[in-house]
Amino acid sequence: MYQKEIEQRRTFGIISHPDAGKTTLTEKLLLFGGAIQLAGTVKARKATRHATSDWMAIEKERGISVTTSVMKFHYRDFEINLLDTPGHQDFSEDTYRVLTAVDSAVMVIDGAKGVEPQTEKLMEICLLRNTPVITFINKLDREVLSPLELLADIEKKLQIECVPMSWPIGMGKSFRGVYNLYRRELQLFTPGASTRGGEVFVIRDLDDPELDRRLGSQADELREDIALMEGAANPFVYEHFLKANQTPVFFGSAINNFGVRELLDAVVELAPSPRPRLATTREVLPSEEQFSGFAFKIQANMDSAHRDRIAFVRICSGKFTRGMKVRHNRIGKDVTLANATIFMAQDRASVEEAYPGDIIGIHNHGTIRIGDTFTEGEELRFTGIPNFAPEHFCRVRLKNPLKTKQLQKGLNQLSEEGIVQVFRPLTSNDYILGVVGVLQFDVTMVRLLNEYGVEADYESVDYAAARWVTCPEREKLENFEKQHRSNLALDSEGNLIYLALSQWRLSNTMEEWPDITMHKTMEHSQRLN
């Protein structure tokens, strides 16, 4: 029974460049999975509904996903956990952390633009982690690049072999649907965002006159394309897909429901069930009986009526049951998980039991941090959940000095969520904020004002790069601190970080101090020295 529950789980994230149609696709997957009845039109600012997965106020205002939503739904005989990731170009750090909690990913490509910069960045992470990727080429209802151009672009830029699983019939105004190369099925859809399905015709033989009747002159084009594909395309090898060496490719139009159902079918048929996870001491198998999991995200104020905080925990092994006692390893305390929840964007429901691959929400009263591990007693720490060295910096100046406590509390919570990193220089009482993408400053500003009543000025500072600093020899580290005190700060964990005024200065310092190690990333909640 327990093994069956594991095999029925599919936990995946959706990654893309901004505006490739990721949020629309997320909604349509939920629609086809029966989780929602009506898809919200994401870009329609005047519409009364907002996209289900973009629920925070700043997201509704700007039409971008800046936090991560977790949505659970049932499809066929499978339990799907879909993680919608920030789509804005500035949110790769938060997106990266989400990719530590998934077993596979769906990559959305805008058919008119091909591979774009954020897609490359996120695919690098998937390839590093050997995360299997299914590709969905979107917006075929518009004028797009040719299918062969798109496949060549993916292979060249992302260094991954493409295997088309479906083939588009026309594009733009002449787009008629998709032909499933593996099922030998022709799928013709009626355009329209409210359509949940479409006509499907089984065409076992491409010479079938039914094809000509349905497609007219496009039937011969389809025959030529498929003959070309079958001669040149690589065969699909499941082991290559699992190692992220090969990606199955589907074509469609999310806004018009073209190709969405077969993409969802591919997720349940091809994407792996929960996989083993690496901890500091050993590999943890999902089939192990003892419960284990890690927090990959902290979200404050999911319910505007209550100042609550939720830790998103990915279950790695064992079975979760409501009211169970677990060990919070970092602080060495046993805690009772009495009110865990599952998510559907902002909607929540109590959960009685959950299995590996599931994402549960645990109420957090300030004790849980990103990267924390929970077990049934074993001393474990799951690895691979890093902080990135920030690339943009600013100084916070309070308009009202009496709000210092609120500022400290707000920054503390936002840094634990991974929204912003907070540094305290060794030579002043300033608060220096560091982010990977500048939009995070806007999010920090809006949330400090709305949630903590903090009005502040945000001044740019001259730092160009940051690196965490370690050295096994105490004396050398102390000498380094003396000479570079004005460029050193402490992060929220008390780790020493070097703030460089330029890339040249950073390189120069690294050359002058070969015994000092400069780290571009570090594990969450880790004390370095």
UniProtKB/Swiss-Prot annotation:
<dbReference type="InterPro" id="IPR027417">
    <property type="entry name" value="P-loop_NTPase"/>
</dbReference>
<dbReference type="InterPro" id="IPR041732">
    <property type="entry name" value="RF3_GTP-bd"/>
</dbReference>
<dbReference type="InterPro" id="IPR038467">
    <property type="entry name" value="RF3_dom_3_sf"/>
</dbReference>
<dbReference type="Pfam" id="PF22042">
    <property type="entry name" value="EF-G_D2"/>
</dbReference>
<comment type="similarity">
    <text>Belongs to the TRAFAC class translation factor GTPase superfamily. Classic translation factor GTPase family. PrfC subfamily.</text>
</comment>
<keyword id="KW-0963">Cytoplasm</keyword>
<dbReference type="GO" id="GO:0005525">
    <property type="term" value="F:GTP binding"/>
</dbReference>
<dbReference type="InterPro" id="IPR053905">
    <property type="entry name" value="EF-G-like_DII"/>
</dbReference>
<dbReference type="Pfam" id="PF16658">
    <property type="entry name" value="RF3_C"/>
</dbReference>
<dbReference type="InterPro" id="IPR031157">
    <property type="entry name" value="G_TR_CS"/>
</dbReference>
<feature type="binding site">
    <location>
        <begin position="16"/>
        <end position="23"/>
    </location>
    <ligand>
        <name>GTP</name>
    </ligand>
</feature>
<feature type="domain" description="tr-type G">
    <location>
        <begin position="7"/>
        <end position="275"/>
    </location>
</feature>
<keyword id="KW-0547">Nucleotide-binding</keyword>
<dbReference type="InterPro" id="IPR005225">
    <property type="entry name" value="Small_GTP-bd"/>
</dbReference>
<dbReference type="Pfam" id="PF00009">
    <property type="entry name" value="GTP_EFTU"/>
</dbReference>
<keyword id="KW-0648">Protein biosynthesis</keyword>
<dbReference type="GO" id="GO:0016150">
    <property type="term" value="F:translation release factor activity, codon nonspecific"/>
</dbReference>
<dbReference type="GO" id="GO:0006449">
    <property type="term" value="P:regulation of translational termination"/>
</dbReference>
<dbReference type="GO" id="GO:0005829">
    <property type="term" value="C:cytosol"/>
</dbReference>
<dbReference type="InterPro" id="IPR004548">
    <property type="entry name" value="PrfC"/>
</dbReference>
<keyword id="KW-0342">GTP-binding</keyword>
<dbReference type="GO" id="GO:0016149">
    <property type="term" value="F:translation release factor activity, codon specific"/>
</dbReference>
<dbReference type="InterPro" id="IPR000795">
    <property type="entry name" value="T_Tr_GTP-bd_dom"/>
</dbReference>
<dbReference type="GO" id="GO:0003924">
    <property type="term" value="F:GTPase activity"/>
</dbReference>
<comment type="function">
    <text>Increases the formation of ribosomal termination complexes and stimulates activities of RF-1 and RF-2. It binds guanine nucleotides and has strong preference for UGA stop codons. It may interact directly with the ribosome. The stimulation of RF-1 and RF-2 is significantly reduced by GTP and GDP, but not by GMP.</text>
</comment>
<dbReference type="InterPro" id="IPR009000">
    <property type="entry name" value="Transl_B-barrel_sf"/>
</dbReference>
<dbReference type="InterPro" id="IPR035647">
    <property type="entry name" value="EFG_III/V"/>
</dbReference>
<feature type="binding site">
    <location>
        <begin position="84"/>
        <end position="88"/>
    </location>
    <ligand>
        <name>GTP</name>
    </ligand>
</feature>
<feature type="binding site">
    <location>
        <begin position="138"/>
        <end position="141"/>
    </location>
    <ligand>
        <name>GTP</name>
    </ligand>
</feature>
<protein>
    <recommendedName>
        <fullName>Peptide chain release factor 3</fullName>
    </recommendedName>
</protein>
<dbReference type="InterPro" id="IPR032090">
    <property type="entry name" value="RF3_C"/>
</dbReference>
